[in-house]
Amino acid sequence: MHFTQVLISLSVLIACGPVGYGDITAHQQPSTATEESEQCSTCEFRQHSKLMRLHAIKSQILSKLRLKQAPNISRDVVKQLLPKAPPLQQLLDQYDVLGDDSKDGAVEEDDEHATTETIMTMATEPDPIVQVDRKPKCCFFSFSPKIQANRIVRAQLWVHLRPAEEATTVFLQISRLMPVKDGGRHRIRSLKIDVNAGVTSWQSIDVKQVLTVWLKQPETNRGIEINAYDAKGNDLAVTSTETGEDGLLPFMEVKISEGPKRIRRDSGLDCDENSSESRCCRYPLTVDFEDFGWDWIIAPKRYKANYCSGECDYMYLQKYPHTHLVNKASPRGTAGPCCTPTKMSPINMLYFNGKEQIIYGKIPSMVVDRCGCS
């Protein structure tokens, strides 16, 4: 049994209590002291349920992302590695526009692990076998085994151009690197770009065909060389960082197709922290990743996870006939029904993995949509 499953089992066992088969009438007019005692007990139990949920969420995220531990990436490293490029900004803008509450068109996933939608791979220095006097310094891209050639929707190479001294035409060249003994390089793309004086820009190049070959024949991936010459022969492509150029190195953005999904239906009892409801109910819970010290999660910085808490008394079991039958069949020694999530939905997350690659994917079963007795 996985650690995550143990945590969930513990929280379920703690949430379970004996089914109340006593005299229902006797509880209709309790004393004030009894009410206060029950409310105090309910608050303590609810707080315990919340803490258990937070603890389980941390373990679930690492498990679903197939991480043994949280990547050791500090805020300074995040600032250095984050590309200041349009595709990343578009993803971040989605969180600003949609917020944490957006549920329109939400779906539930069958898979227990995260599904990848977009991968952003940063350029690194290529293998010495393709270099002469340690040149070129750029660019090699390593790819996650999650990427399958037949699932690639789009693959774009993003290159940042330094400002030209005057309006000019820039010749952007992409060459595939090969061992020096085999010729060193082979040009695969060449573009002409008109630029204005003093203006920086990001340029994107379609590299789906190249990436497909690399994935099918990994031994051919030695990296690429990028040049962007203006009319005076100046290379404007940023392929090594200088002062003030953090986040401007080339990177590849790979869009992956998603798997099948189902439309989610919402229903169930909702409560807030001030509610006096004793029945099984869904309560709000905001998870703040900064409180966890998880700087490796780029977005969202927080999300609404929700949690379940409350009683599953005999009088409520008519809503859950299967649980009622189980308890009637074995009235002694049973823990009774538990208040647990009966419907959950995924969250989208932008994060660094252990290889310092930026991943945009979907993590299933992270938001409690409905609670019930089972």
UniProtKB/Swiss-Prot annotation:
Disulfide bonds join 271-281, 280-339, 308-371, 312-373. Glycans are attached at residues 72, 274. GO terms for biological process: cardiac muscle myoblast proliferation; immune response; muscle organ development; negative regulation of cardiac muscle myoblast proliferation; negative regulation of growth; negative regulation of growth rate; negative regulation of skeletal muscle tissue development; negative regulation of striated muscle tissue development. It is found in: Secreted. This is Growth/differentiation factor 8. One of its GO terms (cellular component) is extracellular region. Its main location: secreted. Induction: Repressed in adult muscle, and stimulated in adult spleen, when fish are grown in overcrowded conditions. PANTHER family: GROWTH_DIFFERENTIATION FACTOR 8, TGF-BETA FAMILY.
